[in-house]
Each structure stands twice: as C-alpha cells, then as structure tokens.
Curated annotation (Swiss-Prot):
Subcellular location: Cytoplasm
Listed NCBIfam families: tyrS
Domain of life: Bacteria
Keywords from the named record: Aminoacyl-tRNA synthetase, ATP-binding, Cytoplasm, Ligase, Nucleotide-binding, Protein biosynthesis, RNA-binding
Catalytic reaction(s) noted: tRNA(Tyr) + L-tyrosine + ATP = L-tyrosyl-tRNA(Tyr) + AMP + diphosphate + H(+)
Motif 'HIGH' region mapped to chain: 38-47
Species assigned in the record: Flavobacterium psychrophilum (strain ATCC 49511 / DSM 21280 / CIP 103535 / JIP02/86)
Motif ('KMSKS' region): 234-238
Name of the protein in its database record: Tyrosine--tRNA ligase
Any Gene Ontology CC annotation: cytosol
PROSITE patterns named in the record: S4
HAMAP family, per database record: Tyr_tRNA_synth_type1
A single GO BP: tyrosyl-tRNA aminoacylation
Length: 431
C-alpha cells in the first residue's frame, strides 16, 4: 500500500497517531471512520479537513466510513467547549442529519459497490434501542470513571469557573467510544480519525475496542492539526461568520471571495491541505508565485480547485464573472445575468438610494438621475462635466448627457448600477 501517513505529513494534515497506525495503513486496505455531529443542517469549511481526509483515505485504497452522529448530536460534544450546549429537538436534528448527508454525498459516492466503496452510517440506528440499564451494564462497566476524568475535555470543564459538566455531556465520550466498537464489530473498522481536539474521545474508543473485542483486538487512532491562519486566528470564519459548504448558507460568490482573499502564507499552506494537486504541481506553483506575488497564482489556483470541488465548474465560472463585474472587465450582459442576491452581495457596501418606479417609467434624464434623484454626484454641473469626460456608465455601458433612464435599464426589475470613473459605484434600488 502507498503510505498515506507520509502524504498527510507533507500536506500538513497530520498531528498525531497511535503506535502501529502507520504500519497498519501500509500493510493492507484498512477501514477507518470519522464522525460528524449534526449541530447544523450543513457543514462549514472547518469540516473540510475531515472530508478531505476521507477522500485521501479512499484514494490510497482504504475504505472510508462517514458517521453522522444522530445519537451523539442529541447530547453535544464537550471537547473544546466552555459551556454546555443547548439540546436540539428531534425535528431540528432530523433536518440537520439530512443536510449533512447531502453535503457528504457530494464528496463521496456512497452508492458504489467496489471493494473500498465509502459507507455512510448514523449512530442513532444502533443507539436508539439501547436502554439505559443495558448501556450502563454492557458499556459503562468497561471504562472507569478515573479514565474518563483524565480526559482534557473533562478536566477543562470541571476546572473552569461556571456550571461544570452535566452527566449527559460526561457520557458523550462513552457513546462515541461505543461507535468505534460497533463499527469494529460490524464493519471491521480498525481506525478512527478526527481533529486533534478529538484525541480523548477517540482513545476512549480504542480502549473500548480492546476491552470488548477479545484477545488480539486492534484499534488505531490518527488526528489532524487545528487549522489556523498565519496570524494565529481561527480558520473558517469571514466577517459574516462561518463559511459554509452549501450555497443556501454561503453564496458561491462569497465562498470564492473568501479563498481568493487568502494571504500569501496561508495560500501556500491551504493549497496543500484543501486540494488534491500533487507535490510537484504545488511546489511549482509556490515557486511561480514567489517570482510574481502580485499575480496571486497560489490564491487563484487554490480558489479554483476548492470552488470546483465544493460547487462544481459551472458555479466557479459564475463566481469569476461576478468578481470581474466589480474588479475587472465586464459587460452589461454579465451584469444582467446576475440574480438579485448575488448582485446585492457584489455591491454590498456600495452607496444606494431608492428611486420611484413611476419616475423611471416616465423616463428620467441622466443628469437628474446623477444628482437630484440619487445624490451620487453633488450638482448638475458636476454631472454634466463627468458626462462630457465620458466617465459615466449605466449598467457598465457609457452614456452621454442625452441618455434617458427607463424601465428597460433595470436589472432583475429592481436595480440600476451607476458608475463614475473606474471605481466609483452607486446602486439605484427601484421601488
């Protein structure tokens, strides 16, 4: 087998592993899993590392299992959390499970039948019929409270000021541990992977497998590092909050812009983590970028690869066109091809004014539009001078002083874009 661990190390995707893990992965095709708790109806780019890890696993000939925590999601993982999580109601949880299934299915084909075909499971399916007494006898008996108390996630919560930790969250590591035992027994799963903050929960699982699996039972663990920005700040958030993997929560345009605005240092790091480009290709891109940083070769390639991976090539092309409207050459047709939501995102922060649809239906001379109707320019004189200098455009098309604004100039029957010079924009919102 090709060495998966070596691949993860040069990509910056490796943090730690249990002894014997690398040997197991190079010896034979191995089944491994990663869990995703349904705390929302989508996943954000922070979860991309784990999804990418599952894809690498499959590409190296191993069998990936994606586990959705329908049961653990009812409890809430205390790892890295300072406060108790609010419990989700069943309807919300079911909606979230369906949403995460859809996201994972866009990266891994769970319908293939080859030997290392990915599997999608939900731990609610094997936990729902477990009575409390049965769980306490069969699972709780195998792990001591001392062992559970030694975990960092527990220590931090019990040592911090506040409410401490409920019994519900305290049992989380036991339920996650049993997931590993169940998958070991039913799918011959030998490895659990996850973020470095999951080490405590994962090793509870390896311990449970060894204690319940009998003589010779093997279980391994591998974790990825916490991804941060070059300045040490948390990765995965923009000014508007989380960057999600579904367009209903983060538009493709905003997703595209997030990656395009990556710093040079971060781009060099992220292109190894978030793309499947090989080492020679990436090394070549890094060298090319160093010779001409202003061309942003790394950022553009990173953005292109990850936007195609998450949203597809067609959506990438739309995002590029949308970006060119504000930052490059574009036409009136490009502008009119935008939906209303993308139009507003592109021109977010651009000055706006409302204008009466009745006025536009009657037709308004451009001088009046630029001054009295919008306040875009300070006076009729300034408007006429700008028009004489050929520096005024309506919807990306240059106009003269004789131009009359009418309903045919509306974008999405709602907007008109005014422009003075190269960079001064103004949006008319037709009401």
């Amino acid at each position: 087998m090709k060495n998966l661990v070596e691949e993860l190390k040069w990509r910056g995707l490796f943090h730690d592993m249990m002894p014997g893990t690398e040997e197991q992965l190079t010896k034979e095709s191995t089944t491994a899993y990663i869990g995703f708790d349904p705390t929302a109806d989508s996943l954000h780019i922070g979860s991309m590392v784990q999804i990418i890890l599952l894809v690498h696993l499959k590409n190296f000939g191993h069998k990936p299992i994606a586990l959705i925590g329908g049961a653990t999601g009812m409890i809430g993982d205390p790892s890295g959390k300072s406060d108790e999580r609010n419990l989700l109601d069943e309807a919300t949880l079911n909606k979230n499970v369906a949403g995460i299934k859809a996201v994972l299915s866009s990266f891994l084909d769970f319908n293939t039948t080859n030997a290392n075909a990915p599997i999608l499971v939900n731990n609610y399916d094997w936990m729902k019929d477990f009575s409390f007494i049965d769980f306490a006898r069969d699972i709780g008996k195998r792990i001591t409270v001392n062992y559970m108390m030694s975990k960092d996630s527990v220590k931090k919560r019990l040592g911090a000021e506040g409410e401490g930790m409920s019994f519900t969250e305290f049992t989380y590591q036991l339920i996650q541990g049993y997931d590993f035992q169940y998958l070991y027994k039913n799918h011959n799963c030998l490895l659990q992977m996850g973020g470095s903050d999951q080490w405590g929960n994962i090793t509870t699982g390896t311990e449970l497998v060894r204690r319940m699996g009998g003589e010779g039972a093997k279980a391994y663990a591998l974790t990825t590092p916490l991804i941060t920005k070059a300045d040490g700040s948390k990765f995965g958030k923009s000014e508007g909050g989380n960057v999600w993997l579904t367009a209903d929560k983060t538009s493709v345009y905003k997703f595209y812009q997030f990656w395009l605005n990556t710093s040079d240092d971060d781009a060099e790091k992220y292109i190894k983590i978030f793309t499947f480009l090989d080492k020679n290709t990436i090394d070549g891109l890094i060298e090319e970028h160093k010779t001409a940083p202003h061309l942003r070769v790394l950022q553009r390639k990173l953005t292109e690869e990850i936007t195609i991976l998450v949203h597809g090539k067609e959506e990438l092309e739309k995002a590029i066109k949308a970006s060119n409207i504000l930052f490059g050459n574009s036409t009136s047709n490009d502008l009119k091809g935008l939906d209303a939501a993308t139009f507003l995102e592109i021109f977010d922060g651009v000055p706006q004014a409302e204008i009466s649809k009745t006025d536009i239906e009657a037709g308004i001379n451009i001088v009046e539009v630029l001054n009295e109707k919008s306040g875009f320019l300070k006076s009729n004189g300034e408007a006429r001078r700008a028009l004489s200098a050929n520096s005024i455009a309506v919807n990306k098309e240059k106009v003269t002083e004789e131009f009359t604004l009418t309903t045919k100039d509306m974008i999405n029957n709602q907007f008109v874009l005014l422009q003075s010079g190269k960079k001064n924009y103004f949006v008319l919102n037709v009401k």
